UniProtKB/Swiss-Prot annotation:
Zn(2+) binds at residues 864, 866, 875-876. The gene is secA. Belongs to the SecA family. ATP binds at residues 86, 104-108, 511. This is Protein translocase subunit SecA.
Length: 880
């Protein structure tokens, strides 16, 4: 029935495209009118649009003209005109949807349309890229359009921030036209480019600031996420964590690592390769107890040891060197499983990183305690409007809709796609597969046809590299180890005779032009020389001629050939690799070479194929090439995708609990930060605290009143008479006494200083308690899986316990803030003068210096001078 209706009315995607192309026709009709405007008149359009918005028009009212203006400015500044399909892409982005546009269709240029239109509101637009190089490159490239139209453009990087300035010229092309600025300035720009990591971390950092002037980000208004599938799906489960060192010893990691070689799979522990989980058997537990000299591994005091053993087994059996991580300068550096890039500075959490350090015999860095954390899923769901672009999103359309409420619109290519995708070639062994891959590379190289080979790990790319060296085939290896030259290698991967081996999707974001990229070639020709703008232009002209000649030759050879050496768990990643060929109507082809020893086939249905090959007596070096086989593999991928989606959906339910708590704490913290006076808030908290204290102590039959008086004296320094008063009268009386005491303290300290002290104590207590809460949540997560064995729903139990923990934290925050405020002691003026005088070094008439008395050093076990009643090391001395 659905199919019949689709035939009559078209699919939803087709109906949407029809609507968009109608709007595009209206934009095209404005082209001649807009192109007749002078530069000056064109520049004035931005102010005109802003005035119209101020008078009550909406963005949709000015959309057609704004898009026509951006198209004209792109022609004048970059010599590039937006195609109709690119205008459709801009419309999709403006409506807060995902535009699926194939590789080479100009997504970078598409973003300028929606970014310009939405920036006119003055609330900020964030354009999110997958790496820092692309963020910088896109600002340098597209900055000319925004600058012409009077918009400011910023770019945030981990160690610096910049504003686009066409007059700021540098010989170093990486930073040319990028004027250094503060991070806050970059965020105040109309449009800000940066990576998902940087935007997310800045959000967390802002929620740890102690002054409103230090905040960088504005309200999260509108984001355009480039390579949206990579960021919102592949990295969705990755939490961004800001952490500080914990006080635990690292010896346990070495001790546990030493016993792993004595524990055997199956007998001592069970491995689940699909879920990457470990379970100790009864025999394994007893063996571990004996080896570690522990009586009972499951005694509550040893529960962390069980966790460390599990992580050590995972480190040895699931995490492979040169695949999941590399050892660099004595440190473990994670390899991104999706892009093959090195993730410098990133660490696995939960003790896994330390377990791998122990496995490799490296110095173990102490496990960090989480200070602030958020997942990409929850960060990006905070934007008022979210949109995205990618070459491959349709396979995950249901996930985008369900989790982010984002619709995917598949946009047709500007020119028909003529790439030929051959069926998979499946071999019995990995050895036979790689020999076939190298043979095919050799054949392409002999005729000069460029080849791009996609591998799933550094190890595999280096294996192919070794085999090619033996055959004398020159090639470039592009993996996590050499990502500095990534863009240059990818840009020239379409030249005659180029052989490029790329780990996974490294180099994403840079187009492979058949015949090569003239800009990169021109820079290569001038490498190591000081050159003028004129010399660069000449080199560029020469490079264009060379590339044009090579382009025609490569086209006649059939274009770029893609070889995949293994299927990824996700069809989308495979499609991304294929999508590197056949851009903008160019010819091209692709083929995947697989073996029954590949991980995907081994875990999902390789046995059936193996028995089929055995039954048909197929030789090791003879491949099966059959559409049915490719279909079976695709079905295996669909199963894995569905499985991974379920995991992400399930984890999101857990994370939503944390998310609502985070929002609660951060909005309270923001209220504190933005407040000029917290005095009313202090009195509000006093009412809550006195209510609870009186109810609690008066419920105790004997000595309740005396205990209440003791508490009031210890915490608030007040003596009270509670005789002959009802419960409500006691509450009213105590509030009156405490307000008086607070007013006196304020008079003594001074109004202005008291406001500063309030803010400092509020923020310090909130941060300390939130940090402790995050640790508590981690402990709940560790044990929650065991609830399933007691026939309880772990999610329900987690929600209940997390809520109780949050309630407890909220009570502790109120209690701690009030105790500290009432205990605070400020030195009197005379004491301050004496203290200052002691610090000044006076000299005698003969020039000899008098000894300066050192103030008494506070010992770590001394009472904290802030008056909290805690030891100095557990309070203000914690971070000393």
């Amino acid at each position: 029935m659905v199919k019949i209706l689709e035939k009559i009315f078209g699919t939803k995607n087709e109906r949407e495209l029809k609507r968009y192309f109608t709007i595009v026709e209206d934009i095209n009709r404005l082209e001649s009118q807009i192109s007749s405007l002078s530069d000056e008149k064109l520049k004035q359009k931005t102010d005109e649009f802003r005035e119209r918005l101020a008078k009550g028009e909406s963005l949709d009212d000015i959309l057609k003209e704004a898009f026509a203006v951006v198209r004209e400015v792109a022609k004048r500044t970059l010599g590039m005109r937006h195609f109709d399909v690119q205008l459709v892409g801009g419309l999709v982005l403006h409506e807060g949807k995902i535009a699926e546009m194939k590789t080479g269709e100009g997504k970078t240029l598409v973003a300028t349309l929606a970014a310009y239109l939405n920036a006119l509101e003055g609330k900020g637009v964030h354009i999110v890229t997958v790496n820092d190089y692309l963020a910088r490159r896109d600002v340098q490239w597209m900055g000319a359009i925004y600058n012409f139209l009077g918009l400011s453009v910023g770019v945030i990087q981990p160690d610096a921030s910049f504003l686009y300035d066409p007059n700021y010229r540098l010989p170093d092309r990486r930073f040319d036209r990028l004027r250094p600025c503060s991070k806050k300035e970059a965020y105040l720009a109309d449009i800000t480019y940066g990576t998902n990591n940087e935007f997310g971390f800045d959000y967390l950092r802002d929620n740890m600031r102690y002054s409103i002037d230090e905040l960088c980000q504005r309200e999260l208004n509108y984001a355009i996420v480039d390579e949206v599938d990579s960021i919102l799906i592949d990295e969705a489960r990755t939490p961004l964590i800001i952490s500080g060192p914990s006080e635990e010893s690292t010896d346990i990691y070495y001790a546990v690592n030493r016993i792993i070689k004595y524990l055997k799979p199956e007998n001592d522990f069970k491995l689940d390769e699909k879920l990457k989980t470990v379970v100790l058997t009864e025999q394994g537990s007893q063996k571990a107890e004996k080896l570690l000299g522990i009586d009972n591994l499951y005694n509550p005091s040893n529960i962390q040891v069980v966790h460390h053993i599990n992580q050590a087994i995972r480190a040895h059996y699931f995490f492979k060197k040169e695949v999941d991580y590399v050892v660099k300068d004595g440190k473990i550096v994670i390899v991104d499983e999706f892009t093959g890039r090195l993730l410098e500075g990133r660490r696995w959490s939960d003790g896994l990183h330390q377990a791998i350090e122990a496995k490799e015999g490296l110095k173990i860095e102490a496990e960090n305690q989480t200070l602030a954390t958020i997942t990409f899923q929850n960060y990006f769901r905070m934007y008022k409007k979210l949109a995205g672009m990618t070459g491959t999103a349709d396979t995950e359309a249901s996930e985008f809709a369900e989790i982010y409420n984002l619709e995917v619109v598949v946009i047709p290519t500007h020119k028909p796609m003529i790439r030929e995708d051959y069926p998979d070639a499946v071999y019995k062994t990995e050895k036979a597969k790689y020999e076939a891959v190298v043979k095919e590379i050799e054949e392409c190289y002999k005729v000069g046809r460029p080849v791009l080979v996609g591998t799933t790990s550094i190890e595999k790319s280096e294996l192919i590299s070794k085999m090619l060296k033996k055959k004398g085939v020159p090639h470039n290896v592009l993996n996590a180890k050499y990502h500095d030259k990534e863009a240059e290698i990818v840009a020239q991967a379409g030249r005659i005779g180029a052989v490029t081996i790329a780990t996974n999707m490294a180099g994403r974001g840079t187009d492979i032009l058949l015949g090569g990229n003239p800009e990169f070639l021109a820079r290569e020709m001038l490498a190591g020389k000081d050159y003028t703008e004129e010399e660069y232009k000449k080199a560029l002209e020469k490079a264009k001629e060379i590339c044009k000649e090579e382009h025609d030759k490569v086209v006649s050879l059939g274009g770029l050939h893609i070889i995949g050496t293994e299927r990824h768990e996700s069809r989308r990643i495979d499609n991304q690799l294929r999508g590197r060929a056949g851009r903008q109507g160019d010819p091209g082809s692709s083929r995947f070479y697989l073996s029954l020893e590949d991980e995907l086939l081994r875990l999902f249905g390789g046995e059936r194929l193996q028995s089929l090959m055995h039954f048909l007596k197929i030789e090791d070096d003879t491949p099966i090439e059959n559409k049915m086989v490719s279909k079976a593999i695709e079905n295996a991928q669909k199963r894995v995708e569905a499985h991974n989606f379920d995991i992400r959906k399930h984890l999101l339910k857990y994370d939503d609990v944390m998310n609502s708590q985070r929002n609660e704490i951060y909005s309270f913290r923001k209220e504190v930060l933005e407040s000029d006076s917290l005095k009313d808030k202090v009195f509000e908290l006093l009412e809550i605290e006195i209510d609870e204290m009186v109810d609690f102590y008066l419920a105790q039959e004997s000595e309740g009143v005396e205990k209440l008086k003791e508490q009031l004296s210890a915490r608030f320094d007040i003596e009270v008479d509670l005789s002959n008063k009802s419960k409500d009268e006691i509450k009213e009386y105590l509030l009156e006494k405490l307000r008086e005491a607070y007013e006196k303290k304020e008079q003594k300290i001074g109004q202005e200083l008291m406001r500063d002290v309030e803010k400092m104590i509020f923020l310090h207590v909130i941060d300390t308690k939130w940090k402790d809460h995050l640790l508590g949540i981690d402990h709940i997560k560790e044990g929650i899986g065991l609830r399933g064995y007691a026939q309880r729903d772990p999610l329900v139990e987690y929600k209940k316990e997390a809520f109780e923990l949050f309630e407890e934290m909220s009570r502790n925050i109120i209690s701690d803030i009030l105790t500290r405020l009432f205990k605070i002691q400020i030195k009197e003026e005379s004491q301050v003068k004496v203290a200052r005088a002691q610090k000044i070094q006076r000299s005698d008439g003969d020039g000899a210096r008098r000894p300066v008395e050192k103030p008494k050093k506070i010992g770590r076990n001394d009472p904290c001078p802030c008056g909290s009643g805690k030891k100095y090391k557990k309070c203000c001395g914690k971070n000393s």
